[in-house]
Protein backbone atom coordinates (compact mmCIF):
# COMPACT_ATOMS: atom_id res chain seq x y z
CA UNK A 1 0.00 0.00 0.00
CA UNK A 2 1.43 3.37 -0.96
CA UNK A 3 0.75 6.53 0.97
CA UNK A 4 -0.39 9.58 -0.91
CA UNK A 5 1.27 12.70 0.39
CA UNK A 6 -0.70 15.88 0.52
CA UNK A 7 1.02 18.62 -1.32
CA UNK A 8 1.24 22.18 -0.07
CA UNK A 9 1.31 23.54 -3.61
CA UNK A 10 -0.63 26.70 -4.19
CA UNK A 11 -2.17 27.46 -7.55
CA UNK A 12 -2.04 31.14 -8.46
CA UNK A 13 -2.92 33.20 -11.49
CA UNK A 14 -0.11 35.72 -11.21
CA UNK A 15 0.44 35.84 -14.96
CA UNK A 16 -3.06 37.07 -15.67
CA UNK A 17 -2.90 39.57 -12.83
CA UNK A 18 0.46 40.91 -14.03
CA UNK A 19 -0.78 41.31 -17.59
CA UNK A 20 -3.90 43.08 -16.39
CA UNK A 21 -1.94 45.53 -14.22
CA UNK A 22 0.52 46.39 -17.01
CA UNK A 23 -2.28 46.73 -19.59
CA UNK A 24 -4.50 48.82 -17.32
CA UNK A 25 -1.72 51.20 -16.30
CA UNK A 26 -0.60 51.60 -19.92
CA UNK A 27 -4.16 52.28 -21.09
CA UNK A 28 -4.71 54.73 -18.23
CA UNK A 29 -1.57 56.72 -19.00
CA UNK A 30 -2.27 56.72 -22.75
CA UNK A 31 -5.74 58.13 -22.04
CA UNK A 32 -4.29 60.63 -19.58
CA UNK A 33 -1.75 61.80 -22.14
CA UNK A 34 -4.28 62.03 -24.97
CA UNK A 35 -7.23 63.60 -23.18
CA UNK A 36 -5.60 65.61 -20.37
CA UNK A 37 -2.00 66.57 -21.08
CA UNK A 38 -2.22 67.06 -24.85
CA UNK A 39 -4.93 69.76 -24.65
CA UNK A 40 -3.04 71.39 -21.76
CA UNK A 41 0.19 71.45 -23.78
CA UNK A 42 -1.60 72.85 -26.85
CA UNK A 43 -3.22 75.62 -24.80
CA UNK A 44 0.15 76.58 -23.28
CA UNK A 45 1.80 76.73 -26.72
CA UNK A 46 -1.03 78.88 -28.09
CA UNK A 47 -0.80 81.18 -25.07
CA UNK A 48 3.00 81.57 -24.97
CA UNK A 49 3.96 80.85 -28.57
CA UNK A 50 6.54 78.51 -30.06
CA UNK A 51 10.16 78.64 -28.93
CA UNK A 52 12.50 80.97 -30.80
CA UNK A 53 16.18 80.84 -31.61
CA UNK A 54 17.86 84.14 -32.51
CA UNK A 55 14.43 85.71 -33.01
CA UNK A 56 13.30 83.10 -35.55
CA UNK A 57 10.51 80.64 -34.60
CA UNK A 58 11.54 77.00 -34.74
CA UNK A 59 8.86 76.20 -37.33
CA UNK A 60 10.72 78.26 -39.93
CA UNK A 61 13.97 76.42 -39.30
CA UNK A 62 12.60 73.10 -40.51
CA UNK A 63 14.55 71.76 -43.47
CA UNK A 64 13.33 69.40 -46.18
CA UNK A 65 14.95 66.42 -44.45
CA UNK A 66 13.20 67.20 -41.20
CA UNK A 67 9.86 67.58 -43.00
CA UNK A 68 10.28 64.12 -44.48
CA UNK A 69 10.94 62.61 -41.04
CA UNK A 70 8.10 64.55 -39.44
CA UNK A 71 5.64 63.26 -42.03
CA UNK A 72 6.44 59.69 -40.94
CA UNK A 73 5.57 60.54 -37.33
CA UNK A 74 2.13 61.98 -38.09
CA UNK A 75 -1.02 60.02 -37.30
CA UNK A 76 -4.65 60.51 -38.28
CA UNK A 77 -5.60 61.48 -34.75
CA UNK A 78 -7.82 64.60 -34.86
CA UNK A 79 -6.05 66.14 -31.87
CA UNK A 80 -2.57 65.44 -33.27
CA UNK A 81 -1.43 62.66 -30.90
CA UNK A 82 1.71 61.45 -32.68
CA UNK A 83 3.63 58.19 -32.74
CA UNK A 84 6.20 59.68 -30.37
CA UNK A 85 3.40 60.56 -27.93
CA UNK A 86 2.08 57.00 -28.05
CA UNK A 87 5.53 55.53 -27.42
CA UNK A 88 6.31 57.98 -24.61
CA UNK A 89 3.00 57.60 -22.76
CA UNK A 90 3.06 53.84 -23.31
CA UNK A 91 6.54 53.63 -21.80
CA UNK A 92 5.38 55.68 -18.81
CA UNK A 93 2.38 53.37 -18.43
CA UNK A 94 4.64 50.33 -18.41
CA UNK A 95 6.91 51.98 -15.83
CA UNK A 96 3.94 52.75 -13.57
CA UNK A 97 2.68 49.18 -13.97
CA UNK A 98 6.03 47.69 -13.04
CA UNK A 99 6.22 50.06 -10.06
CA UNK A 100 2.81 48.85 -8.89
CA UNK A 101 3.89 45.22 -9.27
CA UNK A 102 7.21 45.78 -7.51
CA UNK A 103 5.68 47.55 -4.53
CA UNK A 104 2.81 45.07 -4.26
CA UNK A 105 5.12 42.05 -4.07
CA UNK A 106 8.03 43.32 -1.98
CA UNK A 107 6.63 41.84 1.23
CA UNK A 108 6.47 45.10 3.13
CA UNK A 109 3.21 45.77 4.93
CA UNK A 110 3.48 49.13 6.64
CA UNK A 111 -0.19 49.28 7.60
CA UNK A 112 -0.09 46.51 10.22
UniProtKB/Swiss-Prot annotation:
Pfam families: PSI_PSAK. InterPro entries: PSI_PsaG, PSI_PsaG/PsaK, PSI_PsaG/PsaK_dom, PSI_PsaG/PsaK_pln. The chain crosses the membrane at residues 20-40, 81-101. Keywords: Chloroplast, Membrane, Photosynthesis, Photosystem I, Plastid, Thylakoid, Transit peptide, Transmembrane, Transmembrane helix. GO terms for cellular component: chloroplast thylakoid membrane; photosystem I. The keyword Secreted does not apply. It is found in: Plastid, Chloroplast thylakoid membrane. It comes from the Eukaryota. The keyword Transit peptide applies. It is a multi-pass membrane protein. GO terms for biological process: photosynthesis. Residues 1-15 form a transit peptide. Belongs to the PsaG/PsaK family. NCBIfam families: PS_I_psaG_plant. Not yet known. This is Photosystem I reaction center subunit V, chloroplastic. It comes from Syntrichia ruralis.
Amino acid sequence: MTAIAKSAAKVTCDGANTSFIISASTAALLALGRFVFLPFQRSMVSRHGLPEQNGVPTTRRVTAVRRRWWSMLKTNDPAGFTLVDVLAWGALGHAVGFFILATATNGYNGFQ
